[in-house]
Regions:
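Short, conserved loop/turn and helix-capping segments at secondary-structure boundaries
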Residues: 27, 73-76
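Short amphipathic alpha-helices within nucleic acid-binding modules
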Residues: 19-21, 62-74
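Short amphipathic alpha-helical segments
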Residues: 17-42
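Short, flexible helix/strand-to-coil boundary loops that buttress conserved ligand/catalytic motifs
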Residues: 25, 70, 83
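A common structural junction motif
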Residues: 32, 77-78
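Glycine-rich beta-strand-turn "strand-cap" elements at beta-sheet edges
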Residues: 2-3, 14, 36-55, 61, ...
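Short alpha-helical segments used as structural interaction elements across diverse proteins
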Residues: 6, 30, 63-67, 93-96
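Short, structured motif recognition centered on aromatic/hydrophobic residues
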Residues: 5-9, 21, 33, 53-58
Length: 110
C-alpha cells in the first residue's frame, strides 16, 4: 500500500502504567488493530524526555481509507471488549494526521 497519510496517535499514560498498557496491547489489542487498520509504521514508548508516553503511527492510502478502517475497528466487538483494559490508563490522547514530504524516506519506500 502506498501511504499518503500517517496517523500519529500519542497517549500520556498514568504514572507507572506503561508496562500494563504495553502488555495488554501486545497480548490482545495490536492483533485487533492490525486486522482493521492495516499498516503499522511503528509503536513506541518514551525512554527519555516526556515520561509515560506512547506513540503509534499508522499509514493510510487516503483519508477515506483511514475513516473506513477506523469505523471498522470501532464496530468490532473484540475491540470494544478490549478498550476498557486500556482506557483508564490514558490521561491525555492526541491525534495528528501527517503527510510525508517528497524527500521523506517513508514516501520513497511506500
Amino acid at each position: 500500500v502506498t501511504a499518503m497519510f500517517y496517523e500519529i496517535r500519542t497517549y500520556r499514560l498514568k504514572n507507572g502504567s506503561i508496562p500494563t498498557y504495553l502488555k495488554a496491547v501486545e497480548e490482545e489489542g495490536i492483533a485487533i488493530q492490525k486486522s482493521h487498520l492495516g499498516h503499522l509504521v511503528g509503536y513506541f514508548y518514551s525512554e527519555i524526555g516526556t515520561i509515560n508516553e506512547i506513540v503509534h503511527i499508522w499509514a493510510f492510502s487516503s483519508l477515506d481509507d483511514r475513516e473506513a478502517r477506523r469505523q471498522q475497528l470501532m464496530a468490532d466487538p473484540q475491540w470494544q471488549a478490549f478498550l476498557p483494559k486500556i482506557r483508564d490508563l490514558i490521561e491525555v490522547a492526541e491525534n495528528k494526521i501527517m503527510k510525508a514530504a517528497n524527500f521523506s524516506p517513508t514516501k520513497q519506500a511506500g
